Amino acid sequence: ETLEQFGYHQYEISNFAKDGYICRHNMKYWTGDEYLSFGPCAASDFAGKRFTIAPDIEKYMDGVLNKGAILSECETVPMRERAGEYLMLRLRTVDGVEEGEYTKSFLLPFEPLEEVFQKLAKQDLCKNVSGRWRLTPKGFMLSNSIIVLLLEQQQKSKPLTQKK
């Protein structure tokens, strides 16, 4: 409330900013966008892979100068795991999650999640605004528990056979 009085608006569970000044860097993570990072110990998420560059400066320089390996880790993230990350990270934002976006991106049904959201809405923990499920201020305070409920429900879902 104090921040709102001074023109700061909440855009993420632990972040407030004046209009036009949200942290674009962190929004990449919260919205699941791809990102590339460079230099020793840099982490990236690009083309379905998550990878980290070697933290040791000598190994990094040797790899760059001699066209050798510079990655210390590289993994392909399974689609269901990405769907879980979408739920967890998007629910941290005031924009929340959207059914069509979720279903199209991850080929998982939204209906089981919708049932959970509707129950939570009756407790004033979330609300549907223009087709997007968002946590309320009360919901933000209980976000970890809410996200666990949704992830448990998501794990039970069977993948769709085709895109909607």
Model-based region annotation:
Residues 58, 81-88, 114, 140, ...:
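Non-catalytic, well-ordered alpha-helical scaffold segments
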Residues 13, 113, 130-131:
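Residue-level detector of family-conserved "landmark" positions at structurally sensitive sites
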Residues 138-164:
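Short, amphipathic alpha-helical interaction segments positioned at domain boundaries
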Residues 1-108, 158-159, 163-164:
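C-terminal scaffold of the Radical SAM
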